[in-house]
Amino acid sequence: MTNEDLLSDSENDEDFAYKSDKEEDFSDSDDESRKLQRRIDAENKQAMAKEEVKVDKDAMRKIYEEMKSGSGAANEIKPVTVKKPDVTTTQTTQQETASTTPTASTTSTTTSTTSAPAPASIPSSAATNKVKKPKRPKKGSLLDAMNKPKKKLNTLEQSKADWGAFVDKEGIGHDLSQHNKDGYLEKRDFLDTH
């Protein structure tokens, strides 16, 4: 068997990955240093977050005291800016590149990032005290009246309205009152009175 036959057999395996001569196994010290770096990064983030909260609380107390004293409206309120300490982190990532050629190599990239200080500003008390009115609908009052849901009538009321409209339309109201002597209501009245 030649090297090409061995490679073609290996490439058919689902879990096959090329390994170059330059690859080195990671030692425990590299793994520990990565864990240590992650822990340090997490602690730095937590410290910066606590500092921001502390600064925000102090600024809010100052604003509250100014509002409480009543002199806040006459004086100009300046936004508070927070300066974050510059933190430089170095991250090393190793990427393996898989290809169909047997000479795949591992690349190592080192990047350095610097976070720029982002000033945080507290909105002025005058802007926060302003009460916003609810927005008025944009339709005209006539359209609002037309779009209101109509009151639904129950079946009995609808039947009475339909019968009344029919009687008025046909003009048979007088005839019904004269010739309705054999109706149910008349019989009930007769029985109740006698």
Swiss-Prot record:
Region described as Disordered: spans on this chain: 1-156, 171-194
Low complexity: compositionally biased ranges: 88-128
Pfam families per UniProt: BCNT
Coiled coil: none
GO aspect biological process, one term: chromatin organization
Biased composition (Basic and acidic residues): 32-68
Biased composition (Basic residues): 130-139
Record field: compositional bias (Acidic residues): 1-15
Chief location: nucleus
Superkingdom of the source species: Eukaryota
Subcellular location as annotated: Nucleus
Keyword Amino-acid biosynthesis in annotation: no
Quaternary state and interactors: Component of the SWR1 chromatin remodeling complex.
Function recorded in the entry: Component of the SWR1 complex which mediates the ATP-dependent exchange of histone H2A for the H2A variant HZT1 leading to transcriptional regulation of selected genes by chromatin remodeling. Involved in chromosome stability.
Stated name of the protein: SWR1-complex protein 5
Species per Swiss-Prot/TrEMBL record: Yarrowia lipolytica (strain CLIB 122 / E 150) (Yeast)
Lineage: Eukaryota, Fungi, Dikarya, Ascomycota, Saccharomycotina
